[in-house]
Amino acid sequence: MGHQPCFRAAGRRGKTIGKGIIFMVRSIVGANWGDEGKGKITDVLAERSDVVVRFQGGANAGHTIINNYGKFALHLLPSGVFHQNIANIIGPGVALDIEKLLAEYDSVVQRGVPKPKLYISDRAQVMLPYHVDFDRFEEERLGKAGFGSTKSGIAPFYGDKYLKIGIQVCQIYDEEILRQRLSSAVEQKN
């Protein structure tokens, strides 16, 4: 029999069992695609977490947090941003509207919240202005048969994501790749 490594818990969140380690993972998942209280539950659990991950969704959704810093409406930032010891991650499934994210981040910091530890997946896809335009055009085209879109570009965004024609964060740093991706997207959209 080979050597079995023994891992010990490095913090209050893990438990050593035998020769292995088990970490506590909490996942808050909504089944109704909407306002079920996921944000409130996440906010309560965030203060006892090491990492908070926003793994999907866009700026169309949001939740209100009331804490010692005041009252905040978060749309893209993970709920852990109010706690300095927490790593906050925006995952690859998020519809990343960079302008809205920066505005939300600045708003939180300007109100006295210490700059949060924020990490963005290089595989997060970027929301582009034409996603919002297409969403609005489609809702107008449907008229009374419209589905009640927030007109924030979510459906066209996820369409591009799953058709693999969108732009990921890692691609915006390479001018040639970005140019190719935009050219391909524009060609398909026209």
Summary of predicted features, one role per range:
Residues 2, 10-14, 18-20:
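Residue-identity detector for glycine
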Residues 23-190:
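Non-transmembrane, aqueous-exposed alpha-helical and coiled segments at domain scale
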